[in-house]
UniProtKB/Swiss-Prot annotation:
Residues annotated as binding Zn(2+) 4: C121, C124, H138, C140
Role, per record: May be involved in environmental stress response.
Protein name: Zinc finger AN1 domain-containing stress-associated protein 17
Zinc finger (AN1-type): 10-58, 98-148
Keyword flag Zinc-finger: yes
Signal sequence, start to end: none
Cellular component terms per the entry's GO annotation: cytoplasm
Entry annotated with the keyword Ribonucleoprotein: no
Record PROSITE patterns: ZF_AN1
PANTHER family: ARSENITE INDUCUBLE RNA ASSOCIATED PROTEIN AIP-1-RELATED, ZINC FINGER AN1-TYPE CONTAINING 2A-RELATED
Organism: Oryza sativa subsp. japonica (Rice)
Binding site for Zn(2+) 1: C16, C21, C39, H42
Annotated positions binding Zn(2+) 3: C104, C109, C129, H132
Record keywords: Metal-binding, Repeat, Stress response, Zinc, Zinc-finger
């Protein structure tokens, strides 16, 4: 049983159960193997030399075919990696098609497409990453329609600029042209 807290605050924290430590820790860790209380320095099975660590440890084996991580439990007989992988291969959960993640089809782009960074092109219907979402960035097959819409947009911008009287008077340098009478005025 761990000694709890101090005389002033008996419910605050606990002392480490390791014999050579006995440090008062205000956020102690309870070991799920041996049931003792330990400080942050001795919280792992290896750090406090837990006798029941083998019962509580978790190990996984990664399937080369589908990329899944299969947990190997000590209570299941333990088995070696080959037996665990063989059982996984016989199950219906092993699907080699899942291992290969979709990638952006743009040459030299190595971006993996996920739900949050995938954009579908309206011109060609290709799924590309966000860096290549514009038709000019991914050599869109429907770029002819994109070029026509760009030309239409430029024509509309030119019409709206021509309708505004102020824009017609604007100089190339960015300033406004003053009427001749104001330019000749002298200020004393």
């Amino acid at each position: 049983m761990a000694r709890r807290g101090t005389e002033a605050f008996p419910d605050l924290g606990a002392q480490c159960d390791r014999e050579d430590c006995n440090q008062l820790d205000f956020l102690p860790f309870d070991c799920d193997g041996c049931g003792k209380t330990f400080c942050a320095e001795h919280r792992t099975y290896r750090d406090h030399g837990c006798a029941r660590a083998a019962d509580q440890g978790r190990t996984v084996v990664v399937c080369e075919a589908c990329g899944d991580a299969i947990e190997r439990r000590a209570g299941d007989g333990g088995g070696d990696d080959a037996a665990v992988l063989e059982a996984h291969a016989r199950s219906r959960r092993c699907d080699p098609a899942r291992k290969r993640k979709p990638r952006c089809p743009v040459p030299r782009c190595k971006e993996t497409l996920t739900f949050s960074n995938t954009s579908g092109c309206k011109g060609c219907g290709q799924k590309v990453c966000l860096k290549h979402r514009f038709p000019a960035d991914h050599a869109c097959a429907g770029a002819g329609a994109g070029a026509a819409s760009k030309a239409a947009g430029a024509a509309a911008a030119a019409r709206s600029a021509g309708q505004c009287g102020r824009d017609a008077q604007k100089k190339e340098g960015g300033g406004w042209k003053l009427p001749q009478s104001v330019r000749n005025m002298k200020i004393f």
